[in-house]
């Protein structure tokens, strides 16, 4: 393979004029330079000359790649148009010198100011296609950009989605060249497949039409026969319905006349009884007012007592608070006394320290003055000073210089050790002061507070236990009273229910009692008697009660018996005993069918038989009384089922509204109560009610105070629970704080003993060793000075040591020590001032606490006096309360007697009114039934008219005179004037008015209708059959053509898919096989010899069948890290992973050179070293690396350097190169 040996840039971006760059024989070249110098422009130049588009070169349009100079100010006198023009050239080019074997190929790309670009190879202009073919032959893929990595591309690769990564593999593998053809063929297949499927569906549909039309021709004749049969059956059904409606109406008319006479007689009796009752009520109201007034007085007195008791408890709360406040203040005073004593000790200690330091300062100042007085004694004249200087130079020459230097080094070391020793002494002093002045004091306070909290907690627990015992006793008393009250209320509720039943339905109760006595008697004599219908069934839900009673109707009080023989024997027995009448339902002879609902299940309606509970043995009887009736939630639902859904059965709403089978709508009737008692039982119930009310009232009054006290105790327990929980939390927190305080004291002691003190000892030892060494050197220095300055010292009269000791160095040392003493005095004064201020503050707090204690004691005394006064008032009120209770008891006894007398009169009147209402309801029911039968007759006749049913008429008025649109009185009159001839109705239908006859006719009509519905005649069946046969031939030919074309295109598609998949998988398999090894090498510790050291990396295809249409997941696991997705890796880890992928892809179709622009930007030093080491290992004559980098860890490993810098005067980037192969690593 070839290599890139050099570049030549002319006016390209920041490079003005012609700039040449040579890479020589280097296989690892680094381009370096400061930011903004033009390094990345070099990358753009390489990309530009190799055909990369401008949008990848950080420029929107090509002309922006031409160098642009800086124009001078237009107002300048030196402005030169020609110079300005030359600084902005009109074109630019880049040449790349590519070594291919022994031949050097010159690649050139030119760009003009108007945006035109051209390409040359060895000076010959070629097209872009030829230019790119030449590069592709050298494995330089322009579209895949396998030869370069732009700045920022590494981060983009690491952040790529699986689909984007798959797209990159397509470009590298070359499978993308088949993408367009693949998608076009796939689209054609989908269209052809859709068309063929649609055509097959049409063919099947037309074939079905042929069969349908053929069958329709055969059904037309059968349809005509069945239609005639249906008309005859509908005629019989209409005659049967009209005949029985007329019979039922005649029976009801006779019964209505008898009821009207009985109602008139009962009304007279009621008027006489009401006048007598009014007189009794007036007397009763007056006595009731007296009792109410007495109860009100008793309530007011009781409320006054409750208020005083509440006030007494309210006094207890501030009493307890005042007691706690006094105890708290006393403990605070004790604590403040300790603080005062301790702070006075601190003040005395710092005053003593201040005196000691001040005396030391005064003594040192006197010493300085004495040294100043001796200064003139050791002063040299000018000649002696010259002599001293000459001798001093001789001294330095003969070894004094070395000694002075050693002594200076020792002094410096000594000063550093002293400073460090002073720091450790300060740390020890700080820790000791922290322990004595803060932590110990805080610990004492925390310990005291903890003991106080424990005492408070024990007191609260004791009080909580006492309150719980009291609360349990109160709750036990209240529960016992509540149970008694519940029992009494339950009895009262039962009594009231029974009273309501008896008072509202007195007549009906007597009838029901008589009926039940008869049934009980029949059960004794005839074992086959089962019981009353309403006793043997009941609604599943309470809301169905009214609807079920409406449906049962006259069968509500019917008697279910085992067979017809038992029923006949029972009827004969009742006649013989003159015991009244009853209806019987024999289980063996009644004919029923299982009711079914020809509608989807819904919560809006339900079959009546499904709404009741009963024993399985009575199922036949329940089917008989319920029939196929339906219970609906609302009237609108019932109307919808009747007239829109065509339901023929009876429809009843839960409010009692009824729609008959014939379409007649009537109101519902209320269900009767279950328990009915006679008049004597009613009187005993009223007496029991009054007695229960008095007992409940007495029990409630007795428990009122207990309930109030229980609530107060319960609130107190709740508050105590909260206080105990808070105190326990505080105790825990206080323990934790105390443990932390002790732990901190231990920490500071351990710090002093184990760390600071050993270090101080060590430093002192070092200081002693330095002093000994210094003394030896000083002695050696003095010996040398005495030898050299011997004659001179004899002349001046004092030694050189004495002279030097009284020089400027001594004065500076004394000044420094004096400053240290002054600083120490200032520190002690500040501490003394702080402690003095703190002592004053504590003293003020102590005085305030004393005053607070006096105020709390005064408040406590006042509260005790208030408590005594309230207790006296409570005693007085309790006596008054007892007196009023006794008076109320006497009044209530008299009231009960009067109430019993009044109840007796009301019961008599209520019985009469109840009987009257029963008669009126019965009369209204008969009227409604007559109207119902009239409406059903009108409806039946209308149905005949609408359905064209010809029934025989013997009157002049016919059904043609009946209006269809309305059902008013006129329509009923017309209906009643129509006489129908029933001779054509068979005898069995005249005698049978049961559901079996109706269902038999309906079943026959339904069977015929089903046959007619199945036949569905089609008059044009033959004509349409011929038409469909022609269309089937056309669509069949079209379908076969589409299937053949689909097969042809599918074969072409599979070939293209195979080529595309093979190219893609070949690239993927290669990269996947080499990726892990490359990543392991990039992440391996350079010092590790383990073969499998480093991280792991892998690629996974999401779709094995069409990998190019799905994504590729890239997973990289750095060394010693657990597995996680790429997005959760750090920036450096992502960069290394991306580089491993790039290197693996490059190794598949290796380009002759690989240019990397600042790929190490996000890497730390270790990873940069690994990348550099990888490049050095893999560089070779067939693989040249050119790296743009700012990090010396990278470029110091390269074979050659290309330096880029900015020439500010020319406003241009410049190049310098350096071959590193001549230098040792």
UniProtKB/Swiss-Prot annotation:
Cross-referenced SUPFAM superfamilies: P-loop containing nucleoside triphosphate hydrolases (SSF52540), Smc hinge domain (SSF75553), Tropomyosin (SSF57997)
One GO BP annotation of this record: mitotic sister chromatid cohesion
Gene3D superfamilies membership: 1.10.287.1490, 1.20.1060.20, 3.30.70.1620, P-loop containing nucleotide triphosphate hydrolases
Domain spans labelled SMC hinge: 527-641
Binding residues for ATP: 33-40
Name of a matching Pfam family: SMC_hinge
One GO cellular component term: mitotic cohesin complex
Cell location: Nucleus; Chromosome
Alphabetic keyword roster: ATP-binding, Cell cycle, Cell division, Chromosome, Coiled coil, Mitosis, Nucleotide-binding, Nucleus
CDD domains for the chain: ABC_SMC1_euk
InterPro entries hit by this protein: P-loop_NTPase, RecF/RecN/SMC_N, SMC, Smc1_ABC, SMC_hinge, SMC_hinge_sf
Annotated motif Nuclear localization signal, positions: 1057-1061
Family that this chain belongs to: Belongs to the SMC family. SMC1 subfamily.
Subunit (UniProt): Cohesin complexes are composed of the SMC1 and SMC3 heterodimer attached via their SMC hinge domain, MCD1/SCC1 which link them, and IRR1/SCC3, which interacts with MCD1. The cohesin complex also interacts with SCC2, which is required for its association with chromosomes.
Biological role: Involved in chromosome cohesion during cell cycle and in DNA repair. Central component of cohesin complex. The cohesin complex is required for the cohesion of sister chromatids after DNA replication. The cohesin complex apparently forms a large proteinaceous ring within which sister chromatids can be trapped. At anaphase, the complex is cleaved and dissociates from chromatin, allowing sister chromatids to segregate.
Record note on domains: The flexible SMC hinge domain, which separates the large intramolecular coiled coil regions, allows the heterotypic interaction with the corresponding domain of SMC3, forming a V-shaped heterodimer. The two heads of the heterodimer are then connected by different ends of the cleavable MCD1 protein, forming a ring structure.
Additional observations: Present with 5710 molecules/cell in log phase SD medium.
Name this protein carries in UniProt: Structural maintenance of chromosomes protein 1
Protein species of origin: Saccharomyces cerevisiae (strain ATCC 204508 / S288c)
């Amino acid at each position: 393979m070839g290599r890139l040996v050099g570049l030549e840039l002319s006016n390209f971006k920041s490079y003005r004029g012609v700039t040449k760059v040579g890479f020589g024989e280097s296989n690892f070249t680094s381009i370096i330079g400061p930011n903004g110098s033009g390094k990345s422009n070099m990358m753009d130049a390489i990309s530009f000359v190799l055909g990369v588009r401008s949008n990848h070169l950080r420029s929107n349009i090509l002309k922006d790649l031409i160098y642009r100079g800086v124009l001078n100010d237009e107002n300048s006198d030196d402005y030169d148009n020609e110079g300005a023009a030359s600084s902005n050239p009109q074109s630019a080019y880049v040449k790349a010198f590519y070594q291919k074997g022994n031949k050097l190929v010159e690649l050139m790309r030119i760009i003009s100011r108007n945006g035109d670009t051209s390409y040359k190879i060895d000076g010959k202009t070629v097209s872009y296609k030829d230019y790119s073919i030449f590069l592709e032959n050298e494995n330089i893929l322009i579209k895949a950009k396998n030869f370069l990595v732009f700045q920022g591309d590494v981060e983009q690769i690491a952040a790529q989605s699986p689909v984007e990564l798959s797209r990159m593999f397509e470009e590298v593998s070359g499978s993308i060249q088949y993408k367009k053809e693949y998608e076009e063929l796939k689209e054609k297949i989908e269209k052809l497949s859709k068309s063929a499927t649609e055509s097959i569906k049409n063919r099947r549909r037309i074939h079905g039409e042929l069969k349908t039309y053929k069958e329709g021709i055969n059904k037309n004749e059968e349809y005509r026969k069945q239609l005639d049969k249906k008309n005859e059956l509908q005629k019989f059904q209409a005659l049967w319905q009209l005949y029985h409606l007329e019979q039922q109406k005649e029976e009801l008319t006779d019964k209505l006349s008898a009821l009207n006479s009985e109602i008139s007689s009962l009304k007279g009796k009621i008027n006489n009884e009401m006048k007598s009752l009014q007189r009794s009520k007036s007397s009763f109201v007056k006595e009731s007012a007296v009792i109410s007034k007495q109860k009100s007085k008793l309530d007011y007195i009781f409320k006054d007592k409750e208020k005083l008791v509440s006030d007494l408890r309210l006094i207890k709360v501030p009493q307890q608070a005042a007691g706690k406040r006094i105890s708290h203040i006393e403990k605070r005073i004790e604590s403040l006394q300790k603080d005062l004593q301790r702070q006075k000790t601190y003040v005395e200690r710092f005053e003593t320290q201040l005196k000691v330091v001040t005396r030391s300062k005064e003594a040192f100042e006197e010493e300085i003055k004495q040294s100043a007085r001796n200064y003139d004694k050791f002063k040299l004249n000018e000649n002696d000073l010259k002599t001293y200087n000459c001798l001093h130079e001789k001294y330095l020459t003969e070894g004094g210089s070395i000694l002075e230097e050693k002594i200076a080094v020792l002094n410096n070391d000594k000063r550093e050790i002293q400073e460090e020793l002073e720091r450790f002494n300060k740390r020890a002093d700080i820790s000791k002061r922290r322990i004595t002045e803060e932590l110990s004091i805080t610990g004492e306070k925390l310990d005291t507070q903890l003991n106080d909290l424990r005492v408070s907690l024990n007191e609260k627990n004791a009080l909580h236990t006492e309150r719980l015992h009291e609360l349990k006793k109160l709750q036990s008393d209240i529960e016992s009273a509540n149970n008694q009250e519940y029992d009494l209320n339950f009895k009262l509720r039962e009594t009231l229910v029974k009273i309501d039943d008896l008072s509202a339905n007195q007549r009906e109760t007597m009838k029901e009692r008589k009926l039940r006595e008869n049934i009980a008697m029949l059960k004794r004599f005839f074992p086959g008697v089962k019981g009353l219908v309403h006793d043997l069934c009941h609604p599943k839900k309470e809301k169905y009660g009214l609807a079920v009673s409406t449906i049962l109707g006259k069968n509500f009080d019917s008697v279910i018996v085992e067979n017809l023989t038992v029923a006949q024997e029972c009827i004969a027995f009742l006649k013989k005993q003159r015991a009244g009448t009853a209806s019987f339902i024999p289980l063996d002879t009644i004919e029923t069918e299982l009711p079914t609902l020809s509608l989807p299940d819904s919560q809006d309606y339900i079959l009546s038989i499904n709404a009741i509970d009963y024993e399985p043995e009575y199922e036949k009887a329940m089917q008989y009384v319920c029939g196929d009736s339906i219970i609906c939630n609302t009237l609108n639902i019932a109307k919808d089922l009747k007239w829109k859904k065509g339901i023929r059965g009876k429809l009843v709403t839960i409010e009692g509204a009824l729609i008959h089978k014939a379409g007649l709508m009537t109101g519902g009737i209320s269900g009767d109560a279950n328990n009915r008692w006679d008049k004597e039982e009613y009187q005993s119930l009223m007496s029991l009610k009054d007695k229960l009310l008095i007992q409940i009232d007495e029990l409630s009054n007795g428990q009122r105070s207990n309930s109030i006290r229980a609530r107060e105790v319960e609130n107190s327990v709740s508050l105590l629970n909260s206080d105990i929980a808070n105190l326990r939390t505080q105790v825990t927190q206080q323990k934790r704080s105390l443990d932390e305080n002790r732990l901190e004291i231990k920490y500071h002691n351990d710090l002093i003993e184990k760390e600071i003190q050993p270090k101080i000892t060590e430093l002192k030892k070092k200081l002693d060793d330095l002093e000994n060494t210094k003394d030896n050197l000083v002695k050696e220095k003095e010996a040398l000075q005495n030898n050299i300055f011997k004659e001179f010292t004899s002349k001046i009269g004092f030694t050189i040591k004495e002279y030097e000791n009284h020089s400027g160095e001594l004065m500076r040392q004394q000044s420094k020590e004096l400053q240290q003493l002054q600083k120490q005095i200032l520190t002690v004064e500040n501490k003394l001032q702080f402690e003095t201020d703190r002592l004053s503050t504590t003293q003020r707090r102590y005085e305030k606490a004393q005053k607070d204690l006096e105020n709390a004691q005064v408040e406590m005394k006042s509260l005790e006096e208030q408590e005594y006064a309230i207790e006296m008032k409570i005693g007085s009120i309790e006596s008054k309360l007892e007196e009023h209770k006794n008076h109320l008891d006497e009044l209530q006894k008299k009231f009960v007697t009067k109430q019993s007398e009044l109840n007796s009169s009301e019961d008599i009147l209520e019985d009469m009114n109840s009987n009257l209402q029963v008669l009126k309801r019965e009369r209204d029911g008969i009227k409604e039934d007559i109207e119902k039968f009239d409406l059903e007759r009108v409806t039946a006749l209308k149905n005949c008219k609408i359905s064209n049913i010809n029934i025989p008429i013997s009157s002049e008025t016919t059904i043609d005179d009946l209006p269809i649109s309305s059902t008013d009185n006129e329509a009923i009159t017309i209906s009643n004037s129509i006489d129908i001839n029933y001779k054509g109705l068979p005898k069995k239908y005249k005698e049978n008015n049961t559901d079996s006859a109706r269902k038999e006719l309906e079943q026959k009509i339904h069977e015929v209708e089903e046959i007619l519905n199945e036949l569905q005649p089609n008059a044009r069946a033959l004509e349409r059959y011929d038409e469909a046969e022609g269309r089937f031939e056309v669509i069949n030919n079209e379908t076969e053509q589409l299937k053949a074309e689909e097969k042809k295109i599918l074969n072409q598609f599979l070939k293209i898919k195979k080529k595309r998949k093979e190219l893609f998988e070949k690239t993927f398999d290669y990269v996947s096989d080499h990726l892990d090894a490359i990543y392991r090498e990039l992440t391996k510790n350079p010092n590790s010899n383990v073969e499998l050291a480093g991280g792991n990396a892998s690629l996974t295809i999401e779709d094995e069948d069409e990998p190019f249409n799905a994504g590729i997941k890239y997973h990289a696991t750095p060394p010693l890290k657990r597995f996680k997705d790429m997005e959760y890796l750090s920036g450096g880890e992502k960069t290394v992973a991306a580089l491993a992928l790039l290197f693996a892809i490059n190794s598949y179709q290796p380009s002759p050179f690989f240019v990397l622009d600042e790929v190490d930007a996000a890497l730390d030093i270790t990873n940069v070293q690994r990348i550099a080491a990888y490049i050095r290992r893999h560089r070779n004559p067939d693989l040249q690396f050119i790296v743009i980098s700012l990090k010396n860890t990278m470029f110091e490993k390269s074979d050659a350097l290309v330096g880029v810098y900015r020439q500010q005067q020319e406003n241009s980037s410049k190049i310098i190169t350096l071959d590193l192969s001549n230098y040792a690593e």
